[in-house]
Amino acid sequence: LDEVYTNGAISRIDIANKTNITPATVSSLTSQMVEEGLLYEAGETFDKKNKAGRKKILLSICHDHSYFIGSEISERYYTFSLTDNLGKIIAQTAYPLVNNEIHLTSEYFISKLQEFLLASPVSIKAIGIALPGHFNYIKADQIVTNNPLWQNFSLATIKGAFDLPVFFSNNVNCMALSEKLYSPDKEDNFLFFNLARGIYCSYVY
């Protein structure tokens, strides 16, 4: 599935060659994904190296299989986006933050996320939240940062407030992942730099 997201329309044999997974296993897994509506057969292409062989059947991502909410937490705003599983934005809103004591709390964030979730016209599969700091999977309650503004911001409280899978990651890592999946000029290996309050670099390989 990662190969299809990264490369676009691709044949089963090309997936097998790129991943070193056996063609039989690739065929079995992709057939199951087609049945589940994750992938669809987008057309055929000729194999230039083997003109006498069968045409390759290309697989692509079904854009309307699942819908997700993505959110970014920052000092100045909370943003919420509703997307399909190809990253197309269906709805988006931002809440500016003025009063730090009230707005920079997990309770206020939850209230705004619940508002956005209730307004969604489609069923949501999961929620992803980009953090202004690191996320520690062992001590998963707080944003790992030296910024005192987030010391009372409880990630565990946020996760427990919703009956959906909730995922956290550093905001620059999220930007780099988006670049990998959706940029038309993507490369297999690149560095993504973000200059803000500090400098952060994410390495994709």
Describe each PLM feature range.
Residues 53-90, 191-205:
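Gly/Thr-rich phosphate-binding beta-strand-loop-beta motif of the actin/hexokinase/Hsp70
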Residues 1-10:
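Short amphipathic alpha-helical interface segments
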Residues 41-66, 168-195:
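Conserved phosphate-binding catalytic cores of ATP/NTP-utilizing and phosphoryl-transfer enzymes
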Residues 4, 15, 26-39:
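Basic amphipathic alpha-helical segments that dock to polyanions
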Residues 93-189:
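Glycine-rich phosphate-binding loop and adjoining helix at the ATP-binding site
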Residues 9, 14-17:
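A short alpha-helical element within helix-turn-helix/winged-helix DNA-binding domains
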Residues 11, 40-41:
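Short beta-strand(s) of the beta-wing in winged-helix/HTH DNA-binding folds
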